[in-house]
Amino acid sequence: FADELVFRYTGEPGIARTKIAYVSELGTARELFVMDYDGYDPRQLTADGFLNLMPRWSPDRRFLVFTTYRNRNTQDIDMIELATGKRWTLVAQGGLNITPVFSPDGNSLAYSSSHEGNAELYRLDTKTKAVQRLTTHAAGDLSPSWSPSGRELVFTSDRSGGPQIFLMSADGSNVRRLTFEGDYNAAPAWSPRGNW
């Protein structure tokens, strides 16, 4: 009811029914949890003794994608359905597979992978499981973030020496550098509406 009132008077969605995904250290493992926005009702999602990191919500809030470190040599990207607890692997290419993030429509997943040697950005079609390589550069490309429209990705790359922020079309074309101040600019995150 509170969320409906907030929306009616502000046009913005309320937070009363929102959840927060987080990582908790349990012994040597890092497990995924969700809790209510006020800290109540924590629920453990993983209990496998692995390092499970970097959870990201699907746009419909039914799924979380995350990086799981099953052994020292590979990091896979898994997805878990919150209602059922069903978990499956989306990316298991060998090497480092990190920083997964859903497109705004939920039809694609952008991530960074080093399975061919160097960290590059890839796009996974969540329905067909087809994978498209987005970047091909001698430098490392990491931390993709979708524009609200889903037409562009911003990411971190050290292709200009130190880490800087770059922008490209969602198909990997039209790559251009955005930051020129400072020696270390990383971990870009697009505002939900794109206006900040």
Task: State where each predicted segment sits.
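Leucine-rich, hydrophobic repeat-scaffold detector
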Residues: 3, 43-81
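A flexible loop/linker signature enriched in serine peptidases of the S9 family
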Residues: 13, 24-31, 47-50, 67-77, ...
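Hydrophobic beta-strand positions that form the internal "hydrophobic ladder"
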Residues: 20, 61-64, 106-110, 150-154, ...
